[in-house]
Curated annotation (Swiss-Prot):
Catalyzed reactions: 1-(5-phospho-beta-D-ribosyl)-5-[(5-phospho-beta-D-ribosylamino)methylideneamino]imidazole-4-carboxamide = 5-[(5-phospho-1-deoxy-D-ribulos-1-ylimino)methylamino]-1-(5-phospho-beta-D-ribosyl)imidazole-4-carboxamide
Annotated TM spans: none
GO molecular function, one term: 1-(5-phosphoribosyl)-5-[(5-phosphoribosylamino)methylideneamino]imidazole-4-carboxamide isomerase activity
Primary subcellular site in the record, as a coarse category: cytoplasm
Organism listed in the record: Pyrobaculum aerophilum (strain ATCC 51768 / DSM 7523 / JCM 9630 / CIP 104966 / NBRC 100827 / IM2)
Record-given protein name: 1-(5-phosphoribosyl)-5-[(5-phosphoribosylamino)methylideneamino] imidazole-4-carboxamide isomerase
Subcellular location per the Swiss-Prot or TrEMBL entry: Cytoplasm
GO CC terms of this entry: cytoplasm
Pfam family, one: His_biosynth
Keywords, ordered alphabetically: Amino-acid biosynthesis, Cytoplasm, Histidine biosynthesis, Isomerase
Amino acid sequence: MIIPSIDIEGGRAVKRIRGQRGNYIFQGDPLELAARFRKAPLVHVVDLDGAEAGGLVNISVISKIAEILEGRCELGGGLRSLEAVERALSLCQYAVVGSLPFKNWPLFRRAAELYRDRLAVSLDYRGGEVLVGGWREKAASIAEAVRRLEEAGPYAAVIVTSVEVEGTGGGVKADIDVKSLKRIARRVFYAGGVRDCNDVERAYALGFDGVIVGYALYAGDLKKCANWY
């Protein structure tokens, strides 16, 4: 499964290089992108401002995106309360949490109990360390994170993002044990550095069930492997 992403900052769709604010390869209309990706099986939507603020910020435009996509989306970015998770699930098929398991374990566990079939966990990492709070804080090693997540799983999905190559088209960089992730989630997705269909195939060969793409949509080429593109 190839999943296009729409990252929202200040009401606009952007693609940051390595997640750095002000360092973009793309800026545009998120509603136009949603219409363009309407035939995709799933769209990954991130509230970048929300990830930094700790709560959904761009809810108005995200609501319109979800309406265009008829709910075929997964939404993350600042979901650090049960209310925020439920708000995301009222718009999209899945809610994506990254900081919550490391910032508030009891609340995360409760969310998993209530919504495990619609809850995805995002592991954004660099140098073997999971990053949270808009990629500004180190939370745990990947191995420690997986051990902790096993306690409350399984989940609908785990999303692995290689921050080092995110937004660069630098190729797949996934030095992580995919098999260990498949023990805690139905599906495991990869994001970061994907430029073209060769990178997509490499991710599949490593055992990932799907690939989230951003850079490849604006500066790469997916025409041979994405029938919605």
